[in-house]
Each structure stands twice: as C-alpha cells, then as structure tokens.
Amino acid sequence: MLKTSLCDLLGIEKPVFQGGMAWIADASLASAVSEAGGLGIIAAMNADANWLRDQIHELRAKMDKPFGVNVMLMSPFADEVAQVVIDERVPVVVTGAGNPAKYMKAWNEAGIKVIPVVASVALARLVARRGATAVVAEGTESGGHIGETSTMALVPQVVDAVDIPVVAAGGIADGRGVAAAFMLGAEGVQVGTRFLVADECTVSEQYKEMVLKANDTSTRATGRSTGHPVRALKSPFTNAYAKSEGSGASAEELGAMGTGALRKAAKDGNYEEGSFLCGQIAGMVNERQSAREIVDDLVDGAEHVLKGACAWVA
C-alpha cells in the first residue's frame, strides 16, 4: 500500500489531494474523495461565510473523515472565511492565490494544519518559516491560476528548500505522474483536472465533455499581463480575452471581462462566455469514473510503476 508520512500527519489513507477548484470543489466532490481515502477539499472561492459554513455542514453530514477547505486569499471574503474555518474546526486549510502569512498564527493556534499552494521556492520558504504543515508545489501545467515554473523543475527545488512535506501538483493524472512526483521527493500529489469528470463532480455537462475531448494542445494560458495568469481550455472566451490582452487592454478591463466567466462554465455550461479552467494533462482524461475509482487508480498505478522500476536497478 502506498503510504507516506503525510498520510499519518493528516489522518488520511492515501496521499492524494483533490484540488480546491472554484465553483467545482464542493461538498459533493470533496466528501467522495475523502471517503475514498484521499483529502477532499471544498473551495471557498469568492463565496461568503454562510455559503462555506453550509458546505462544511453538508460534507460532515455525508462522512466523518478528514477534509480541507481551500481559502482563496484574493477573495473579498477572505477575512470572514479565515474565521469560519476556525469556528468550524476544519482540520486542514489549503491556501491559494497569495501569501497566507496574516492568517497563519490564528490557524496554527486553532490546531488547523495549514498547507499553502506555492509556485516558487521563495514563497515555500516563507510559509515554512511561518508554521506551514506542508506545501503544495504547483507547476505551470495546472489549470486555473498558475506560476511560470514546471512541476518537474519546481518540486525538487521546493523539496530541497524546506523541511516540511511537499505535495506535487500540475500535470498529474495517472499512476505514472504520482510515481514521478514521489521520485522528485514529494510525499503526496494534488490532482484537479481528472476529478472534473468524476461522477460526484457537479460541473456542467458541457465542461465535462470538453475535458473528455481535450488533447495535449487544448489549453492556453492568458492574463500574464495582469500578473495573474490562468490556464483554461481553448474556447471563444479565451480567444476574446487573448485578443483584448494582445491589444493592450488594462488589467481593470481584463478583470471585468473575466468576472463570472468560471461560473458560466462550471454551472451554466456557457461555451461562448465561460472560462473552462483545466490543466495541460486533460488529454489523458478519457473516461468518467467515481471519485473512489480515480483515487484507487492513481495509487494502484503508482504502486505498479514503482515496483516495476526496481527491476531496472542491478
């Protein structure tokens, strides 16, 4: 059985995190992943405290295993969401889109295990000094907000830079990716794109079909001029956004253009106006499965690869 120190640290059976994808990672998906032995994560996104509290209660009504909440630090509700995870005794907080330092003391004092998503060695070192339990080193292959460094390059550098467990994210969709991440020094993986087509994922049918039909060149990154690049499946929206960006549109204009685009994709299935966030690995996601089947396939596949690799060493 594939088990690392991270499993013991978090009380999970399998070293697989489900990505905290906004408008996607809700109680339905998160509870299914946690029930399968991984770490299911609810995405707080730009929602207010009441929405998050309801999602936490819904998840706990389904199961009693460890789970996490992803706090998007750019959210206008970040302060109140940061308090909700304390009030609700959330066991794990994963942070994204910023530096969580201002909240970490309170979270640590509440006994919450804090795992920031980082795209650089510098941020990994900073949050480790502030008391992070672990970090998610996320490469540019990921869907959604991205950095500039690939997973293959980022993960080993972060592993060497900090003395806490590292979770690899970006471009991982099967056991080979999991095994590769472990060989780079990671103690777990975070997977987003493959869970988009999980049976328990509540995204629109349009979104799922686009992921299933994607190939290796189906995504593009936009928004670099704003300082907040995003990777999504190519669509009329990404084409229009890239055209505006290339024409010199301001960050404010681009921000207004993107407002609500992810919701239109995830909930409405609006092909023309939706932003279908997705990682470069989408071309390997070819079938619908339950969350349990996905978690088991990731872990079993990694075990098979790692055992087979031993035969290469004389």
Mark where each language-model region is.
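Glycine-rich phosphate-binding active-site loops on the catalytic face of alpha/beta enzymes
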Residues: 22-23, 38-49, 136-148, 172-207
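Conserved active-site-proximal phosphate/metal-binding subdomains
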Residues: 153-167, 173-314
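Active-site entrance/lid segments in N-terminal catalytic domains of soluble metabolic enzymes
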Residues: 1-165
